[in-house]
Every structure is written in structure tokens, then in C-alpha cells.
């Protein structure tokens, strides 16, 4: 697995440098459009300043912002022991040094993501809807996928690559809007004095590059994002030795009709499945943040003989119908056999699903500081945190209960 991580880091560096070159060239061209004599270097300086500020904000507070925007709340082990145990199992299986924090998102839409640019401050967040639908094997598959993103340093890379992309888009938009809102007159009057022709050429090039640079950067970013989803699936199979768990989880996520209202275009690439489903169907493969979920499921269900990377690579090529180097050759040299395990977890029935849905609702109430009283009649009384009285009557049997503050 370490070969895959190293290869991932090399490719990440190449992409990061490529996006950096696009950012620098964009800054130089736009700066030259303002002033052909030395303006290009000023443009590069300001482009790097913008990127640096956004990077610092992301490094120190990015995870907090993402979790807050997603309405995710941190939970302790007593709130959901099974989820904590699974995260801990996958942390041990992956050989990761630090235990990620665990968050639950208050949404009925099943989904999950991982975040954290610093190795000692990572987090795995799952929705209440995911907990309501999945059995243990399926939940383990999802957590293993997210743990793979952390171990492979995808979270770090996608965060800073996303900032680079955001800087390119921001600078381009500011430049184009400045032209739209009356900037053109200033350029014309200036160009009529001395280097009119040179500035006009730079202006045409700048407009074209300001339009094309964000598109090129996004296509590159999305292509790498899609590939990393495949690699996280492959690593999850290696960690769990049970591809059907993740395949079944992805199937249930895909079948869900609930909308994840807290997701947006910025946070969408972080999730295990595209949360913007209604928009995602209209997009081509080039502009999608995730590979087709049906294809991911077919690959997982075609894995045979073992849970090694080479087994995933074989299934990947079979479904794609062509040879394609998804996993670096250095990671395929491991000849040790990792056998697939058989599931001992039963599928959810209609009754058990209802029970889990109620439990997921109770979890979110517990996270939001509700307290619970189990009445002898079998009713669980849920008391909101702002309830002021010292006693409460059971709405079913009328029994009086004291409230311990």
C-alpha cells in the first residue's frame, strides 16, 4: 500500500505544479494587460498572494469551515459505539497513526466524506441517513473508503488543489468583471498614448486566457478527483477484504432520492458519491467530480480471487474494456495473497430498517443535547435541551418522571 501512496504523492506533485503554472501564467498575462511594462510580474505577485492567503486559511481553519458548512457535529463513542469501532478498525487496518474525529451530519441523504490537511487532525463525517440504511459491512466499506482518502493524503491534495483552482477562477472572474463594469475605457485611453498595439494584443490574450484557464484547470482537477475515487475504492477493498460491502453501500446511496441540502459545488468532490445528483446527471464525464457510481459498483462486484490491488486493477480493466493504468505498476508487484472474507451480516429487513432509522434520529437528538427517559410502558421520552420543568408525564401511560439536570 505504501507504493500506492508514494506514487499518489508523485502524481499529486505533478498536478499541483501544473495548476501552479496555470496560475502564474494567468497572473502574468492579466498583469501585462493592465501594464505591458512590468505589469506581468505584478500580476504574478498578486496571484501568488491570493493563493497564499487562501491556503493559510484552509490549512488552519479549512476543516472546521467544511464541517460547519456541512452541518456536521462531532460525536463521542457513547453516542454511536458501532461507528466509532468501525473507524478505529479501519485506522488500525490502514496502519494510520492518529484516530480521526467522528462527525454525524444531520441529513436523511446517505453520504460521507473525510477531511483534514494535518495528519493529527483528520475527521470522518457520515450522514444520519447513511447510518439509517447501512448494515455493519456496508458502513465499514464506506468508512474504509474515507479512511483511504486520509491515508493516501487525498484530503490534503484535493484541498490545496481546490484552492489553486479557486484562485484561478477568482482572479479570472475579477478581471472579466472589471472589463464588464467600465474598465475598458481606462485601457483604451492608456493604450492610445504609447504601447497601444502591445497592450491591445495582451488584452485579447488576457480575455481568452481568463475564460479558458478556469475551464482547463477544472477539467484537470475533476479528472484527478475521479481517479482518486477509484483508488480509494481499491484501497477500501484491501482494508476490508469485502468488496460487496462497499458495492452494496454505493447501491443504496445511489438509490436514495433525498437531497443533501448542505452540499455545494465546492464541497461535492469531498463526498463518497456526488451529492448534487440532479445536476450531476446533466454533466458529461469530463465535468463530473465522481466516476459513474454504477461503474464503480460493477468493478467491485467483478473482483475475484483476492483483495490485492492487482485484483481491483483486473476488474477495472474488465469493466472498462481496455488496458488502463489506474494503479501504478509499483503497487501491483505485491505477490502476497489477501483473501476475500464472507459476510456474516444479514441484509436489513423492513422492520430492522425502521428501527435503525429511529436510532439515527435519536443519535442526532443526542448530538443536539436531547435527554431520554425510558418509561416502563415501553415509550422512549425525548426531552429537548430547553425544557425547563423538573418533571414530565409520559404521553402514553401518564406516568410521572423526574428530570435529572
Region locations from a protein language model:
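A Zn2+-metalloprotease active-site environment signal
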Residues: 1-75, 100-142, 150-242, 248-265, ...
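A broad structural signal for alpha-helix termini and local helix breaks/kinks
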Residues: 34, 94-95, 240, 304
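Zn2+-dependent metallopeptidase catalytic core
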Residues: 77-98
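Generic structural signal for hydrophobic residues
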Residues: 83-87, 232, 246
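Residues within alpha-helical segments
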Residues: 88, 233-237, 297
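Cytosolic-facing loops and C-terminal tails of multi-pass membrane proteins
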Residues: 197, 201-223, 239-405
Amino acid at each position: 500500500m505504501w507504493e500506492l501512496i508514494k506514487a499518489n504523492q508523485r502524481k499529486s506533485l505533478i498536478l499541483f505544479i501544473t495548476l501552479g503554472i496555470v496560475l502564474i501564467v494567468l497572473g502574468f498575462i492579466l498583469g501585462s494587460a493592465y501594464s505591458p511594462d512590468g505589469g506581468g510580474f505584478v500580476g504574478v505577485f498578486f496571484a501568488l498572494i491570493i493563493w497564499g492567503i487562501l491556503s493559510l486559511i484552509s490549512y488552519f481553519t479549512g476543516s472546521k469551515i467544511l464541517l460547519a458548512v456541512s452541518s456536521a457535529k462531532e460525536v463521542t463513542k457513547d453516542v454511536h459505539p458501532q461507528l466509532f469501532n468501525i473507524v478505529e478498525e479501519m485506522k488500525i487496518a490502514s496502519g494510520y497513526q492518529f484516530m480521526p474525529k467522528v462527525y454525524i451530519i444531520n441529513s436523511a441523504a446517505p453520504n460521507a466524506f473525510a477531511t483534514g490537511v494535518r495528519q493529527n487532525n483528520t475527521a470522518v463525517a457520515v450522514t444520519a441517513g447513511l447510518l439509517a440504511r447501512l448494515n455493519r459491512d456496508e458502513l465499514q466499506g464506506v468508512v474504509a473508503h474515507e479512511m483511504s482518502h486520509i491515508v493516501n493524503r487525498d484530503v490534503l491534495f484535493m484541498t490545496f488543489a481546490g484552492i489553486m483552482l479557486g484562485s484561478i477562477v477568482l482572479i479570472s472572474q475579477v478581471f472579466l468583471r472589471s472589463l464588464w463594469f467600465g474598465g475598458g475605457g481606462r485601457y483604451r485611453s492608456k493604450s492610445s498614448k504609447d504601447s497601444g498595439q502591445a497592450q491591445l494584443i495582451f488584452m485579447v490574450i488576457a480575455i481568452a486566457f481568463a475564460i479558458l484557464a478556469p475551464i482547463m484547470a477544472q477539467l484537470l482537477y475533476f479528472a484527478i478527483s475521479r481517479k482518486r475515487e477509484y483508488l480509494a475504492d481499491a484501497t477500501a477493498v484491501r482494508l476490508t477484504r469485502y468488496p460487496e460491502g462497499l458495492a452494496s453501500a454505493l447501491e443504496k446511496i445511489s438509490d436514495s432520492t433525498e437531497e443533501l441540502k448542505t452540499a455545494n459545488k465546492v464541497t461535492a468532490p469531498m463526498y463518497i458519491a456526488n451529492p448534487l445528483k440532479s445536476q450531476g446527471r446533466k454533466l458529461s464525464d469530463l465535468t463530473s467530480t465522481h466516476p459513474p457510481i454504477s461503474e464503480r459498483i460493477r468493478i467491485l462486484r467483478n473482483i475475484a480471487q483476492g483483495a490485492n490491488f492487482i485484483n481491483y486493477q483486473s476488474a477495472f480493466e474488465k469493466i472498462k474494456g481496455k488496458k488502463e493504468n489506474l494503479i501504478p505498476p509499483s503497487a501491483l508487484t505485491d505477490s502476497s495473497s489477501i483473501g476475500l472474507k464472507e459476510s456474516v451480516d444479514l441484509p436489513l429487513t423492513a422492520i430492522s430498517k425502521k428501527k435503525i432509522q429511529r436510532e439515527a434520529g435519536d443519535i442526532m437528538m443526542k448530538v443536539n443535547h436531547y435527554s431520554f427517559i425510558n418509561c416502563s410502558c415501553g415509550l422512549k421520552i425525548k426531552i429537548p435541551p430547553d425544557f425547563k420543568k423538573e418533571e414530565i408525564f409520559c404521553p402514553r401511560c401518564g406516568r410521572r418522571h423526574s428530570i435529572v439536570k
